[in-house]
Amino acid sequence: MSLLPYALARPFLFGLDPETAHELTMASLARTQGTLLSAAYCSSKVSDPIELAGLKFSNRVGLAAGLDKNARCIDGLAAMGFGFVEVGTVTPKAQPGNPKPRMFRLPEANALINRLGFNNDGLDAFLANVRKSAVRQKNAKNALLLGLNIGKNAATPIENAVDDYLICLDGVYPHADYVTVNISSPNTKNLRALQSDEALDALLGRIAERRETLAGRHGKRVPIFVKIAPDLDDAQVAVIATTLKRHAMDGVVATNTTLSRDAVKGLRHAEEAGGLSGAPVLEASNRVIGQLRAALGKGFPIIGVGGVMSGLDAVSKIKAGADVVQIYTGLIYKGPALVAEAANSIKNSR
């Protein structure tokens, strides 16, 4: 979608409830992908390849998980010029998420607050959608590097969370270019407790063991990334970095949404519960990225996400220590033109 059509569509979309606007956009994208109408969303892809974790990224800008929770729009999203796309978060069983309203715009801050709670159609429906996407077929002309993001059901006790992650890992493994283990959403009760020292060590130990089994079964070793929060102190980041390396994780996604409201105090909806995304997260996310890079060294892949609203923001993530970046809230505020803007800015910054 070019800048002008999105500029025309945005007032209409922003006149709707945020979740209604999201559902309408995704339904439209799902219906039109692969047709002439999908040209409205298309953007020429910037070529800026990089290899990370044995994967070849066609450029340095990807879509963050959360926009396409059910993998319904993979083909349409691929046409926007992303170097990679991450879909999910998927849980073993379908679940409705938290009560509505659960998504709020803070336009003065180019931000969103959501407390969706991993609403999704479940693993079986998710995998069916992945399998039928055109860009995932063998010998597809426009093959897409695809990440599949996994989580736990809200009804699963936190002490049994590993069971949900293993169920999802078993299911997504044959279909993923990489898998992201989401332990940082603030909208599933106690989920972030999995970032603590002992809990993370136990979880990643089990995931690493299962990955070895799956690698033997499927004849390929799929990289595993772990998505963490921005609301971590220096000591917590250091422990996470050590644990990632101990269990031979392949990369880290930094970061998820924040619980902090320091940057949006006094704004309408600022006190709504949930995770804050968009421009106010940029600084906190970059801080964590920098700490991770210092702790992990040069060769460990970092996907930077949080607050990318412009090409300059994308470059700031790379300078902080990320190898590639992801966008989500920026796409809502700026439209699909942000993909090429960010990718070109990164390419031209070197």
UniProtKB/Swiss-Prot annotation:
Topology with respect to the bilayer: Peripheral membrane protein
One Pfam family cited in the UniProt record for this chain: DHO_dh
Biological-process GO terms, alphabetical: 'de novo' pyrimidine nucleobase biosynthetic process; 'de novo' UMP biosynthetic process
One Gene Ontology cellular component annotation held by this UniProt entry: cytoplasm
Principal location: membrane
InterPro entries according to UniProt: Aldolase_TIM, DHO_dehydrogenase, Dihydroorotate_DH_1_2, Dihydroorotate_DH_2, Dihydroorotate_DH_cat, Dihydroorotate_DH_CS
Subcellular location: Cell membrane
Enzyme superclass (EC): oxidoreductase
Entry note: cofactor: Binds 1 FMN per subunit.
Keyword tags: Cell membrane, Flavoprotein, FMN, Membrane, Oxidoreductase, Pyrimidine biosynthesis
Residues annotated as binding substrate: 69, 114-118, 182, 187, 256-257
PROSITE patterns: DHODEHASE_1, DHODEHASE_2
Gene Ontology terms, MF aspect: dihydroorotate dehydrogenase (quinone) activity
Gene3D superfamilies found in the cross-reference section: Aldolase class I
Residue sites binding FMN per the record: 65-69, 89, 149, 182, 227, 255, 278, 307, 328-329
Active site: 185 (nucleophile)
Pathway stated in the Swiss-Prot or TrEMBL entry: Pyrimidine metabolism; UMP biosynthesis via de novo pathway; orotate from (S)-dihydroorotate (quinone route): step 1/1
Catalytic activity: (S)-dihydroorotate + a quinone = orotate + a quinol
EC number: 1.3.5.2
Names of the cofactor(s): FMN
Known role: Catalyzes the conversion of dihydroorotate to orotate with quinone as electron acceptor.
HAMAP family: DHO_dh_type2
Family, as annotated: Belongs to the dihydroorotate dehydrogenase family. Type 2 subfamily.
Quaternary data: Monomer.
NCBIfam families tied to this protein: PRK05286.1-1, PRK05286.1-2, PRK05286.1-4, PRK05286.2-5, pyrD_sub2
UniProt name for this protein: Dihydroorotate dehydrogenase (quinone)
Taxon lineage: Bacteria, Pseudomonadati, Pseudomonadota, Betaproteobacteria, Burkholderiales
